[in-house]
Amino acid sequence: MSFYTSSSSQKTHNLNTRQSPDPDSSPASSPGAITPTTSHTETAGSSYFSNLLWGGLFRRFTSEPSPSLSTENSPPTLRHAHTYQPDGEDDGRNLGKSVDGIYTPPHFHHRVPSPMGLPQLEPLQLLGFSARTRTESRLLTPAIAEEVRNLVPTRLSIVDEWNLVYSLDQDGSSLATLYDKCDRYRGKRVGFVLAVRDTEGGIFGAYLSDVPHIAPNYFGTGECFLWRASVQAPLPPPPSLIDSEDTPDVGRSTTIRAEQNVASGQVNAHSIRFKAFPYSGVNEYYMLCGQQFLSVGAGDGRFGLWLDSGLEKGVSSTCQTFGNEPLSDEGEKFGVLGVELWVIGA
């Protein structure tokens, strides 16, 4: 055929090299069959065309996978999906390996606390007493101060020097003087410890989160708390150790001398019973200061600790702010013998 020879010389060349039939021969036919008479070149060209067509279609369908088969037989996968070992032993190196089973988070080693404990705090130093102040007139002792120190905020508990701001014995009996001496600490992140002594010798007070100052409303934070400290006398010796052959057991009394002078304030830390009353969360009546009074804690018309302007009388009742018991053994009302105010972190 002239079509194949004129359009593609290369195909004609391949055809001539692949098939070279004898020009004098004709294809065999069965008896009785009608055989068309065609030339050998036309027969070879049509055979090559059919082989080329069917061969191309066969290669196309066998080389490219069917989209419908691949999507139906295989589940969808994410290229960046991560799967873990179901036994929890995946250490991060088996990411991308899909497994069957319930997902279990990878196992990590638990952190072990350091055997090294916190460093011990330095002993407190109470600074500010004048040389003329007698030892028995000092209210806050190192033993009581250490108990209060355990409850103040951490940023202040590491401070090992407390400074005396006001002392009734050194500065006189005046609440206005106390306010004046506190003005220099306005705007600073400091804390205050208030200590009071009643006429029976009881020591109690409060921790103040803010500077005491005259204000129309309550102020302060939940860091405030009330406290009281009482000296515990040692137990008397048993009767078997007392040589009293002629003394009857009924009505016996024993006087025990303390190991140290309690009036001087120098007592053993183990002989002090310290009790604190932290913030209860009921209300926010932490501090309220006026010209005629200073109070800490309130609720239902009662004050946890209240002092008058002359620092001569005080009141201590159960209040909702701290849920405390009365701080003075004298009752809700007591007389004042001493007042001290200490600053921490100045």
Curated annotation (Swiss-Prot):
The keyword Glycosyltransferase does not apply. It is found in: Mitochondrion. Residues 138-345 form the TLDc domain. Residues 1-19, 64-76 have a biased composition (Polar residues). GO terms for cellular component: mitochondrion; nucleus. It comes from the Eukaryota. Residues 1-42, 64-108 are annotated as: Disordered. InterPro entries: TLDc_dom (IPR006571). Keywords: Mitochondrion. SMART domains: TLDc. Disulfide bonds: none annotated. Belongs to the OXR1 family. May be involved in protection from oxidative damage. This is Oxidation resistance protein 1. It comes from Podospora anserina.
